[in-house]
A protein has these predicted regions:
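Basic, Lys/Arg-enriched alpha-helical interface segments
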Residues: 2-59, 94
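A short catalytic or substrate-binding loop motif that flags glycine-/basic-rich loops and adjacent residues
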Residues: 62-65
Length: 95
């Protein structure tokens, strides 16, 4: 399956990197690359591996060794990455 990152998910990664970079630029790059690597490595061949999402019609990939969760939606042969959230964040009712 193809991975398609939404503009919102890309913005989430950009903001996350900037936030972490205030304290540790090297760690910021590493965290963002870790998230991207896990999504791109795991979901194309195992799109159902994420848990059922809090928002109907979505699934969630928990990124190992981080507090981040990536909600996504399956549409035909595409895994649409919707957002990148901190697990402690209050989630919206729709994505």
């Amino acid at each position: 399956m193809t991975i398609l990152w939404s503009p919102e998910a890309i913005e989430d990664l950009t903001l996350l990197r900037a936030y972490i970079a205030d304290d540790n630029p090297a760690a910021a790059r590493g965290v963002v690359l870790h998230i991207i690597h896990n999504v791109e490595l795991l979901l194309p061949n195992n799109p159902q591996m994420g848990r059922p999402g809090r928002v109907p019609g979505t699934r969630e990939l928990v990124i190992p060794k981080t507090p981040f969760v990536v909600p996504y939606r399956l549409q035909r042969n595409v895994v649409q990455i919707l957002r990148v959230y901190h697990a402690a964040r209050r989630w919206p009712e729709s994505l």
